[in-house]
């Protein structure tokens, strides 16, 4: 690996930042864990999903496997994930997320987790899980990457969304974030050139949207980000993340330390859109 790449400049710092906002690093996932640690049809983390399902639905513990089967079926429907979304928001007869008490849910992340159906596959840079459900993924590029974020938009809209083999993974994903860790620049405010953008699933085309935190007094850092109660970084977890992705060499580099700042464009948008209270609200 080159010493400075999209992984070292954006991906690794973003993963460490997620630990500051309430996420637990799940560890690196490989295909040999399919069927035991995760379900390859949906990329649901099986032990976490089972544990949380039984915790949130103590009177329906025996229905865990049937619900998992139902989710598998729903995700193959050509409905842009509407069926799964309705299940996700439901509170009766069973619930997958506790929207009233955030503390009853678990939040995990991993990286380079392959979404595979037959011979077709793609691998988001970072995947976020709520109660074991892969509800969000993040794609990162290094600053000033060739083609800017327009290249990422083109890849999603021409390669991933139209591919029916990816439908199940798009249907379960509620939020997609794309960033090259730069401040916004867009042609006429429409075409994504640089910055951090988001979209939701689509059959063929999804517009990349800007996210700007409320900042009525035009402060340098928006109040939500400025006042957020970040957790301290656990150095052992940080070292594990870097080790899992062969990035130990960057640990003491000035560039890596700079990109760990909570107020980089990527880290700001993660706080704004993926902090547990915000993600469940969105």
Predicted regions and their residues:
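An alpha-helical interface "stripe"
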Residues: 1-282
């Amino acid at each position: 690996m080159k010493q400075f790449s999209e992984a070292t400049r954006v991906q690794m710092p973003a993963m460490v930042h997620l630990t500051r906002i309430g996420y637990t690093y799940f560890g690196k996932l490989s295909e040999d864990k399919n069927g035991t640690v995760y379900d390859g049809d949906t990329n649901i983390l099986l032990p976490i999903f089972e544990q949380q399902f039984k915790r949130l639905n103590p009177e329906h513990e025996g229905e865990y496997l049937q619900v998992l089967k139902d989710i598998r079926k729903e995700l193959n429907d050509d409905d842009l994930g509407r069926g799964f979304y309705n299940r996700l928001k439901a509170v009766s007869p069973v619930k997958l997320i506790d929207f009233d008490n955030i503390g009853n849910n678990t939040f995990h992340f991993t990286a380079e987790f392959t979404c595979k159906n037959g011979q077709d596959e793609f691998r988001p840079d970072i995947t976020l899980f709520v109660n074991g459900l892969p509800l969000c993924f993040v794609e990162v590029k290094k600053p000033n990457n060739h083609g800017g974020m327009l290249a990422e938009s083109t890849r999603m809209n021409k390669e991933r969304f139209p591919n029916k083999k990816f439908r199940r993974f798009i249907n379960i994903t509620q939020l997609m974030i794309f960033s090259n860790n730069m401040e916004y620049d867009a042609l006429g405010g429409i075409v994504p050139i640089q910055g951090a953008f988001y979209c939701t699933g689509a059959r063929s085309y999804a517009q990349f949207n800007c996210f700007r935190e409320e900042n009525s007094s035009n402060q340098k850092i928006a109040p939500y980000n400025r006042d957020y109660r970040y957790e301290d970084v656990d150095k052992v977890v940080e070292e594990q993340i870097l080790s899992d992705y062969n990035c130990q060499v960057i640990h003491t580099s000035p560039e890596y330390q700079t990109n760990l700042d909570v107020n980089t464009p990527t880290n700001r948008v993660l706080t704004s859109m993926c902090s547990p209270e915000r993600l469940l609200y969105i």
